[in-house]
């Protein structure tokens, strides 16, 4: 058999939830048009993605879209996707760059929780100190929400010390890494770090963080999925590709 000669064939997930994607057109630095959005969705579907949480950037003192505007765009994109027979369901979210008034803006519903629930995709600057991120996680948790720390591998204080990731996860934060980091797109050191997280089962979600329909920031996840199923426990991989997102966010 071919799989005996060349190694075990990777399982294909029945569902894949992309929890981090800049798919909505003209709203941030992601897709620039509905045409590009549809191309991104076609790529995502071909990669096995079945559900996408749209996570446009939300940054204090920027010209951010309101949750209502995000909803309107999602409805329009979903209609176009259906019209073009692209079998993907899109949900509301934001990628929120943490700021000190987070709780006030959350209470005022200024930005989107993930699918109207209790999870918020939360971003930091690469050079933010661990004490700042730890305090931010505590602040978000105090609101009753759970921070999903976006692309944790980008933060110097995390990538230099896996125990810092363990600490914020033990506090109650969830951890997201990018699919491209698993395959080496972020470089050797990043790849080594995310695989150390995966070995310790410190990752809760995989996202593409896609911004474009071509180049290096497209919604590719199949190569990542194949690697995960070959290297790690199948039930754990199921959970980070779709199970956790289905249970905690999409429900």
Predicted regions and their residues:
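Extended substrate/RNA-proximal surfaces in nucleic-acid metabolism proteins
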Residues: 7, 63-176
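Hydrophobic "anchor" residues on beta-strands that sit immediately upstream
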Residues: 14-18, 52, 119, 147, ...
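Short acidic/histidine-rich active-site segments
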Residues: 202-218
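Mobile, glycine- and charge-enriched loop segments
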Residues: 8-26, 162-176, 183
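Active-site beta-loop-alpha junctions enriched in small/polar residues
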Residues: 22-24, 57-58, 93-97, 125-127, ...
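Mid-to-C-terminal alpha-helical segments outside catalytic/metal-binding sites
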Residues: 4, 222, 226-251
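Non-catalytic positions within long, well-ordered alpha-helices that form the structural scaffold/packing
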Residues: 45, 141, 169, 198-199
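An N-terminally biased module of ancient metal coordination in phosphate/nucleic-acid-related enzymes
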Residues: 1-86
């Amino acid at each position: 058999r071919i799989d005996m000669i060349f190694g075990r064939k990777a399982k294909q997930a029945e569902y894949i939830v992309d929890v981090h994607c800049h798919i909505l057109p003209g709203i941030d630095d992601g897709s620039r048009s509905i045409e590009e959005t549809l191309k991104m969705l076609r790529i995502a579907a071909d990669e096995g993605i079945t559900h996408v949480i749209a996570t446009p950037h939300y940054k204090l003192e920027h010209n951010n879209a309101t949750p209502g505007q995000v909803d309107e765009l999602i409805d329009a994109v979903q209609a176009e996707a259906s019209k073009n027979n692209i079998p993907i369901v899109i949900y509301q979210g934001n990628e929120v760059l943490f700021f000190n008034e987070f709780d006030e803006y959350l209470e005022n519903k200024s930005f989107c929780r993930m699918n109207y629930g209790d999870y918020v995709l939360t971003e930091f600057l690469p050079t933010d100190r661990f004490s700042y991120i730890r305090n931010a996680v505590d602040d978000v948790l105090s609101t009753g929400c759970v921070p999903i720390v976006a692309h944790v591998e980008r933060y110097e204080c995390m990538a230099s010390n896996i125990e810092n990731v363990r600490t914020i996860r033990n506090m109650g934060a969830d951890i997201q890494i990018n699919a491209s980091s698993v395959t080496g797109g972020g470089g050797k050191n990043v790849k080594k770090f995310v695989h150390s997280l995966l070995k310790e089962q410190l990752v809760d979600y995989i996202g593409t963080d896609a911004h474009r329909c071509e180049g290096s920031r497209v919604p590719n996840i199949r190569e990542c999925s194949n690697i995960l199923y070959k290297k790690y426990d199948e039930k754990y991989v199921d959970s980070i590709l779709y199970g956790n997102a289905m249970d905690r966010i999409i429900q």
